[in-house]
Amino acid sequence: MRNKVSEMSGRDAEVVRVVVSPYRICPLGAHIDHQGGTVSAMTINKGILLGFVPSGDTEVVLRSGQFDGEVRFSSGLSSSAAVGIAYLLALESANGMNVSPLDNIEYDRLIENGYLGLRNGILDQSAILLSRYGCLMRMDCKSKEYEIIQPREPQNSDKTKIQKSYKVLLAFSGLRCALTNNPGYNCRVAECQEAAKFLLCASGKAEMDPRLCNGEYFHLILFSSFVILQLIMILIFFQTVEEEVYEAHKNELEPTLAKRAEHYFTENRRVAKGIAFLTWSFEIILEIHVYLVLCFINLWIYFIGSGLEAWKSGNSQDFGKLISASGLSSIYNYECGSEPLIQLNEILQRAPGVFGARFSGAGFRGCCLALVDADRAEEAASYVRSEYFELQPELASQLNADSAVLICKPGDCARVI
């Protein structure tokens, strides 16, 4: 990259800077970022490379190095956010500006919402800017609070099959259509807002911004004092008012709006189950046998997610099941997808070694993603190529055989190197 930019610009390779802006996947939390929901995401080792040389003046000269990358345009991996962030980081670096990731998330949201006209949330930008290698990023899109969560390392005594190393499989459909040209995406966002407006009116909060996250939070603070240990637990029961209101009034909602709200609330619960980001406090309480607290823990588990702390415990199988459940909700409640994408998703579900699969991105075109046993990734990729060609020969023939299904590893955050 440095040599190519050096040739184009006539400058020494030593002064060339390179932005690495990775693509992202969203295992859980699809289509709820624009409603202020809680999302999860990680980056992969594929993305945008942007080489540049600071010019010292106000002129910007752009040239294309190549368009022969492995990942096709409109693939459902957030390429628009990756490009926007690459430009932001390059321009900031060239001008000696130090901009925080949270500010850049907002700047790129303005690019997507204002310039491109796409009514999406902040999931894509947050994943690209905040992710860390091998970790899952969790973000509350209402408060913008986030956490980087690392799965538990298998212990020597772990003999279970659930703690397997994984890779990410990306299977491309061959469908290409810009989201700004497809009314389906923005229409779904509007329907979510209509559902939120109805539910807020039903709960006497009509003045609030019509997003499904809006309502009240209930904070419960428990304090236990011991000779050595002082334990402060803060349990936040998520969106209790909204879900109670939804359950009470969902039969009054127009059926389409009820489906959108159902996807939002169930997807929030799947994120919580998949991540279980307060597992540590539960383990401490078990050890000290605070039985009164355990009564409240039962309520906490109801909202945060029960038993199998999938991601944090390294349970790829249960985490994969949640991914697949999220995909089904995207099809039946959010009603995105198309026949080729749904077929591709079903093929991935049957593929050897796959823990779970779903659409990637908006789910109107592009690709499907799967979490797959690292030892069976090649076998799964071969199976998907063959099966998809049988069902969709015309679309499959448009794909490069070598990149129709990609085997990816986790990536890192966007950065200048």
Go through each PLM region and give its residues:
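Conserved phosphate/anionic-ligand binding catalytic regions in large, soluble enzymes, centered on
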Residues: R24-C26, D33, L77-A82, R119-I128, ...
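Inter-helical turn/loop segments and adjacent helix faces that build the functional surface
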Residues: L91-P101, R176-P183
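A short glycine/serine-rich beta->alpha loop
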Residues: V15, H34-T38, V71-L77, E112-G117, ...
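DPxDG-like acidic metal-binding loop motif
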Residues: G37, T43-K46, L77-M97, L369-V372
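Alpha/beta catalytic cores of group-transfer enzymes, especially the acyltransferase/condensing modules
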Residues: G96-Y146, A357-S360, I407, G411
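Short, conserved phosphate-binding/catalytic loop or strand-edge motifs used
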Residues: E70, I85-A86, I105-R109, R365
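C-terminal nucleotide
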Residues: M1-L28, L49-G69, C135-R358, A370-I417
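Structural signature of FAD isoalloxazine-binding scaffolds in flavoprotein oxidoreductases
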Residues: G37-D57, S131-R132
